Amino acid sequence: EVGLRLFGALCKHIKRQRISVEGSVRLISDINLYSDFVGSLRQKPLGPYFRALRELGQIYLVRIDAPAASYFGGGVKKGSRMAAKGASSTTMAMQAKELAVIIADTRRYGGVFTVEEVLGFAERRADWFAVRGEVERGMYGVGCLVM
């Protein structure tokens, strides 16, 4: 019971925080320490919960480089802004697709978290508002054509 309460408290705490890529390293480190503590309790049923929590930390670790030209146009000519936006948005789309794959992989979380729950955690990324559209496009396949 103590382990499940700790798991619930950690999940609740993570959902309250905005977590950056740099903060994800600390989060993963802390989760590993909690996981080691729970392992020392020798309660095997708790293992999958904390393994899923360790995997969950990976969604904050994926760096997505938002295109600067779309936010700040200072000093960039119109023609070059479009070229820069196209090149960086391709990179951003690939990075967002990588994050979408991590979010949608249900086997990764061992049935502890559903895709919707993982998406709820992903919404706590510090850059979520900038990358939300690309991640959802990668997850749900918006813009796909069926031939």
Regions found by a protein language model. Give the residues of each.
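Extended alpha-helical "rod" scaffolds
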Residues: E1-M147
